[in-house]
Amino acid sequence: MRYLLLILMLFPALVLADDLVYKLTIRDHRFEPAEIQVPAGKKIKLIIENQDPSAEEFDSHDLNREKVIPPKSKATVFIGPLSPGRYSFIGEFHEKTANGVIIAE
C-alpha cells in the first residue's frame, strides 16, 4: 500500500518531466529573448516573468493563447505540441515594442 501511495504521489512529477521548459522575460515592455527555438512535436511549458511595473498580456493568435501577467510576477503558459513553423506573439498592452516569435523545428 505504501508503494502504491508513493507511485501515485510521484505520478504528476513524472508527467511534467516530459514538458520542455522555456523562460521569457518582459522588461522595458519587450520580450527577452524575442525569438525562441523549440522542437516540433513536443509540449512546451513557457514561464513568463514580467519585470515591468505594469501588467502585460501575452497574446498569440497563432498559438491560441492569451494570458495577463501582473507587474512583478510570473505566469505559466502551456503550448504545443507544435507543427514545424513560426508562431508570433505580442504583448497586447505594448504591441509596438513587445513582440516575438516561437520557431518550432
Region spans (language model):
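Positively charged n-region of N-terminal signal peptides that target proteins for export
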Residues: 1-4
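Short alpha-helix capping/helix-loop boundary micro-motifs
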Residues: 29-31, 61
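Glycine-rich phosphate-binding "P-loop"
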Residues: 16-17, 56
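N-terminal signal peptide c-region/cleavage motif recognized by signal peptidases
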Residues: 12-13
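Histidine- and aromatic-enriched segments that form or immediately flank copper-ligand environments
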Residues: 51-71, 100
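Extracellular/periplasmic metallocenter environments
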Residues: 18-23, 30, 70-105
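Short, surface-exposed secondary-structure edge patches
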Residues: 33-35, 66
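Beta-strand cores of secreted/periplasmic/IMS beta-sandwich domains, seen most often
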Residues: 35-52, 74-82, 88-90
